[in-house]
Amino acid sequence: MDLRDLKTFLHLAESRHFGRSARAMHVSPSTLSRQIQRLEEDLGQPLFVRDNRTVTLTEAGEELRVFAQQTLLQYQQLRHTLDQQGPSLSGELHIFCSVTAAYSHLPPILDRFRAEHPSVEIKLTTGDAADAMEKVVTGEADLAIAGKPETLPGAVAFSMLENLAVVLIAPALPCPVRNQVSVDKPDWSTVPFIMADQGPVRRRIELWFRRHKISNPQIYATVGGHEAMVSMVALGCGVALLPEVVLENSPEPVRNRVMILERSDEKTPFELGVCAQKKRLHEPLIDAFWKILPN
């Protein structure tokens, strides 16, 4: 049984979405399906019940999840034991990311890193995702989780984690904005928009306006922080374009007040990854963190 197959299985068991897990594991959906089929053939049991959009674990799948978690943990512990025979790393590593990324992408990375380097102290700062790249460039953070800009600074190294789906969201509860967008062909030039004040998400909405030939959009507010954009949409202030993962990790009372109007096409993926200064990649702590990333 391949450890990579077990890692992929665990991600799918958590996400319950083939497309999302395929993007996160950097494989095609067909490759992901083959990995799951290989496990099912090895065990002689179906692991998932599939429908058009999601999957759910079978009883055999639940048992394999426990086995996979224990096996991968034991493997990490073995790696740690072997690493202890050599010089161990210690010190502080300063990481910056958004609140959403701290929930959605950072935990599994930190689990792997701390399993191998338990003496390293992690200093985590959260804030506006649009500031992440600048935090690395200025040295305020050793590493950051950031959306890849259209032009990556030459001094910055970027390791991709996932291509994120981008969605246009609107209020789900009755309000004037919902009435505007609920017709067959909304007049987007009159719909109020909540926009990011900077960063890749800001660039995305500008491209959206251009594609819809909106030269003078109605901007209700520009906001620092994608999480605040979701809250303003939930309050009925306008619509917003942002990564779907932000909505997925919003508090349930907020999430229930928002609906998705459309998803971006896959031709223009929103790349999320970890960045660091190229000239610092040789430093022991940053080098160790870089090596445990999926890429």
From Swiss-Prot:
One GO MF term: transcription cis-regulatory region binding
Key words, A-Z: Activator, Amino-acid biosynthesis, Branched-chain amino acid biosynthesis, Cytoplasm, DNA-binding, Repressor, Transcription, Transcription regulation
Similarity comment: Belongs to the LysR transcriptional regulatory family.
UniProt xrefs under InterPro entries: IlvY_PBP2, LysR_subst-bd, Tscrpt_reg_HTH_LysR, WH-like_DNA-bd_sf, WH_DNA-bd_sf
Protein name as catalogued: HTH-type transcriptional activator IlvY
Biological process per Gene Ontology, one example term: branched-chain amino acid biosynthetic process
DNA-binding region: 18-37
GO CC terms of this entry: cytoplasm
Domain annotation HTH lysR-type: ranges: 1-58
Cross-referenced CDD domains: PBP2_IlvY (cd08430)
Major site of localization recorded for this protein: cytoplasm
Annotated localization: Cytoplasm
Role noted for this protein: This protein activates the transcription of the IlvC gene in the presence of acetolactate or acetohydroxybutyrate. IlvY is also a negative regulator of its own expression.
